Amino acid sequence: MQHHPLPEYPRPALRRDSYENLNGLWQYAITGSAGLPAKWDGDILVPYSPETKASGVGRTLQPGAWLHYHRSFVPPAGTGGRVLLHFGAVDYACAVQVNGHLVGGHRGGYWPFALDITDALNPAGHDRLWVAVQDPTGTGVQARGKQTLRPGGMFYPAQSGIWQTVWLERVPENYITELTVTPDYDARTVTVKAHTSLPGGAANLWAVVRAGGVTIAEDWGSDEADRDGAVTLHIPEEHFFPWSPDSPFLYDLTVGTTQGEEEQRDTVHSYFALRKWSCAPDVHGIMRFCLNGKPILLNGLLDQGYWPEGLYTPPSDGAVVRELQTIKELGFNLLRKHAKIEPQRWYYHCDKLGLIVWQDMVNGGGPYKLWFVTYLTNVFQPLLRRLPDARPLWGLLGRETEAGREEYARELEATVKTLQCHPCVGCWVPFNEGWGQFDAAGAVEAVRRLDDTCLVDEASGWYDQGGGDVDSLHNYFYPLRVRPRSRVVALSEYGGIAWPMPGHEPPRRAYGYGTAKSRAELTARWKKLQLETVLPQLKKGLSALVYTQVSDVEDEVNGLFTYDRAAIKPDPAAVRAVNQALEAAFEKTVE
């Protein structure tokens, strides 16, 4: 593992020229108190959690303990303005000091945050940074996904602390804090609004749109823009290139502020796409997902985003790109990002490659009664999948406390606001299999208030309340029978055929849904499932497929890739051929 991992710019949708990456070796200590440790335990490779092999530590942060980080740093080149310290994600709650001054903190293990550290900097240099972290894992109500202190089966080792890039940038005194970009496919426009750091909220802007390096639309601060703090630019018809998996066109966007002297103005770079999601009946009256007005078969994989050396954190940006490119080359167009939020570069690569993302809200809440929410409901799914998620059920689902429900609302808003700039995100998934579920109908309303451009899968698997756009089925054990519904039918989890590939076996007991004994058997069972079970259901209304899963994860050996991503387990040519057959059958069905 390199000593300066993940050096790439971490925020592609809001870029500046100033950038100083702080990934690398830091000092660390694990103690029983929040105070600065008397001594350091050793070095940790940031941004890898201490529980991971890649960190060089291999220790688990227990609830109630404190994880401390320390390093020196040099601010970005330049003078004046403000210096911002950015964290891609820290799990879960942290306090940050610079030169002994508390500069801020954050709670929430999956979302980026920035702190203005200018006033704490040492004029003579020699700046020092301390970060103190606590993580309750399964003892709290916060979002935690598949993390557990007792890993096994479908649950994985807990991790804590800094797990995404840490970086610095120098900005003007009045800088853009948030950029809201709203494309309108039907109107062929994009509306850009920015908020700035100084009082007053929205900024007066100029904006330029480029397509393939050619300027196609611009607004240099008109009176109309100055009045409402936003600019709307029209895309010429000859440069109207809708985004899709077959043609993932991205427009380049440059935005700047117009207030003050030139050195006080801010300029940022971004991008956007023109695409439109909808649900509509096909020629036979069966509800289908539509992208840019045309029915589309969403054919994808469940993606949990774990890596053997770094757990949540990939070994390199290149490894991420190679995996996504291979998935696309195998003929898939969809990834369901399951119980995790990725670093923003992951979504950027999906934007560029044309991979559609269904994004789960990361599950949290109190302890789940797994005997009910997972095992009993799975076995008796035909009877239980539409149980009302009313208050009497909240204790079984881990949402009995008001604090837990308030935490979920805060996390939902943070998730949508963080990721809605990415055109690859096509569907929000508020709940999965009842984990932490409550008032799914209210969650759908909250999502649509924040983003009305995407689909919503209200409750993936079960405890479906009849809302959202998707009738979302999980099926590992029963014969698959689909019939047309008022919502579009998705098979949002299925398959999961296990095979512990020789040389890539799991560290503990192998886990999956039925086990193959060889590559040939795995390939044959995959083909039979897809062509004999799934394909006939397309004409009955099945419109989205999410096979479990991208890769093996810890004990789970039901991935198409091995855990280390070194091999594709079934025959790749067979996978491509099956996906082509599914696409051809769907096209014939909706003609």
PLM feature spans:
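Accessory carbohydrate-binding/adhesion or oligomerization-edge regions at the termini
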Residues: 1-54, 132, 136-141, 212-214, ...
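Surface beta-strand/loop "capping" patches
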Residues: 170-200, 283, 288, 582-590
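Signal that preferentially marks extracellular ectodomain short beta-strand elements
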Residues: 115-120, 232-248
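Substrate-binding/catalytic cleft of secreted carbohydrate-active enzymes
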Residues: 334-579, 585-590
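Short, aromatic- and glycine-rich surface loops/edge beta-strands on solvent-exposed regions
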Residues: 128-131, 247-259
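Beta-strand-rich binding/interaction modules
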Residues: 96-98, 189-222
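N-terminal carbohydrate-binding accessory modules
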Residues: 179-180, 254-327, 581, 588
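Accessory beta-strand-rich segments of carbohydrate-active enzymes
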Residues: 8-13, 18, 27-32, 59-175, ...
